[in-house]
Amino acid sequence: MAQAFQFELVSPERLLLSAQVTEVVIPGNEGYLTALAGHSPLMTTIMPGVVSVKLADGKTDSYVVFGGFADITPQGCTVLAESATHVDDIDPADIQHRIDHARKVLEDASSNEHRTKAEIFLHQLMTLQGAILPA
């Protein structure tokens, strides 16, 4: 049986989850990563995506996050999200609103650097939309 560790998912509004888990999959900026008990210390930024959690009792749960960072230690993992919600509570209109806003930011980009960042963010949102919402 996998060893459990403490996991917390926090948004500015509230603590979404504080539980003993055996595995957490996080959408890091360099790709998805899996945190397990005893993981080497790591701090990483996260991209919009789905945080998947395997609870100590074997149940799984998923949360949609929109940026932030993850702090992983051998004893636990904390995700501080800019915005987060349970996957079952996602409002398709909210995702579409974020995509529309990202498109506007892209149109108004004043430099190549801003344009590149806006393109990446828009792509991440559209990927997230395709992953969690039915076609």
From Swiss-Prot:
UniProt subcellular location: Cell inner membrane
UniProt KW Glycoprotein keyword: no
InterPro entries in alphabetical order: ATP_synth_F1_dsu/esu, ATP_synth_F1_dsu/esu_N, ATPsynth_dsu/esu_N
Recorded topology in the membrane: Peripheral membrane protein
Subunit: F-type ATPases have 2 components, CF(1) - the catalytic core - and CF(0) - the membrane proton channel. CF(1) has five subunits: alpha(3), beta(3), gamma(1), delta(1), epsilon(1). CF(0) has three main subunits: a, b and c.
Annotated family: Belongs to the ATPase epsilon chain family.
Name of the protein in question: ATP synthase epsilon chain
Organism the protein comes from: Brucella suis (strain ATCC 23445 / NCTC 10510)
Gene: atpC
